[in-house]
């Protein structure tokens, strides 16, 4: 099938599904616009009732219906800054022959992809947990004829978000990959790191989860709530911060050194709980997209097996 015919098939599936999307998505999310990006890639603009606005999503559609879906979250800038899986890695080529839909939301800078308890002057209305676990999957399943089996992956800021969303999403995600993150929230280290990320975007951490270290922060502390990951397929990776052959772009050794220590401790926590996980500790890697691309390639077979890709 030619690329143009594949794109036409995707568009037809979207158009045909619009009448049923309202019933499948919760509550009332829908495709507000679409545009081809070449081959089976498209931009789908999805209206989020929770946030009261349209969210861009870059989508790599599988060649046929019935494929599972990988939700691929980017780092602190949310992808709107031109720094993302789409912009800085080979995702389009890598997934071209894979039986999976890949969805890359654009936005959510410095929000941790969570539901903020109050609107914020810096980040606006952030209800990303609701969007990613309740609104967007129904739209994607209806538009692309997806199987309903999902995995999620995050990197850097969104690594802990991916784990948190897997816990809080119940059966929504069968598998998760957390690459170079730090899944703490409610202890002094977690409070410092989470607050710093929110502040980078001009946000008030109190508008995110209330009083730092309080009840809502504890609800989102992945380390403390790790037991809820039982039964999920889990892939963890991080490096030492020492630049290596895979690194491309600006290396950030201190960030990766911290992520490496956090990830090692979290892998140990899962081991203590008897929860299986694949943990890759790289001797080199400095928090760059070259490293993250390598990690995603290694994570994929584990995610694929869990969702039937």
Predicted regions and their residues:
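Hydrophobic core
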Residues: 12-20
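Bacterial N-terminal signal peptides that target proteins for export
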Residues: 1-8
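Non-catalytic cap/lid and distal C-terminal segments of serine-dependent acyl enzymes
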Residues: 8, 20-309
């Amino acid at each position: 099938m030619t690329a143009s015919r594949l794109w036409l098939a995707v568009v037809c599936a979207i158009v045909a599904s619009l009448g049923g999307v309202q019933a499948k998505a919760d509550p009332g999310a829908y495709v507000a616009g679409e545009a081809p990006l070449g081959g089976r890639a498209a931009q789908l603009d999805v209206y989020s009732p929770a946030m009261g606005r349209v969210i861009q999503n870059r989508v790599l559609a599988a060649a046929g219906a019935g494929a599972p879906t990988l939700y691929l979250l980017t780092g602190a800038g949310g992808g709107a800054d031109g720094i993302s899986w789409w912009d800085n890695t080979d995702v389009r080529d890598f997934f071209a022959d894979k039986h999976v839909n890949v969805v890359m939301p654009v936005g959510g800078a410095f929000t941790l992809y969570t539901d903020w308890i109050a609107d914020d002057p810096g980040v606006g209305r952030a209800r990303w947990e609701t969007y990613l676990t309740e609104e967007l999957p129904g739209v994607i399943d209806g538009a692309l004829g997806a199987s309903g089996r999902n995995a999620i992956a995050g990197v850097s800021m969104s690594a802990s978000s991916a784990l948190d969303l897997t816990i809080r999403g119940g059966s929504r995600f069968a598998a998760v990959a957390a690459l170079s993150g730090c899944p703490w929230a409610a202890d002094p280290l977690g409070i410092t790191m989470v607050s710093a990320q929110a502040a980078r975007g001009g946000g008030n951490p109190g508008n995110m989860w209330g009083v730092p270290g309080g009840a809502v922060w504890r609800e989102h502390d992945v380390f403390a709530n790790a037991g809820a990951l039982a039964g999920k397929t889990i892939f963890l990776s991080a490096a030492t911060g020492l630049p290596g052959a895979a690194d491309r772009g600006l290396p950030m050794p201190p960030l990766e050194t911290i992520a490496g220590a956090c990830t090692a401790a979290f892998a140990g926590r899962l081991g203590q709980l008897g929860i299986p996980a694949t943990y890759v500790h790289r001797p080199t890697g400095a928090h760059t997209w070259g490293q993250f691309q390598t990690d995603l390639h290694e994570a994929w077979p584990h995610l694929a097996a869990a969702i039937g890709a």
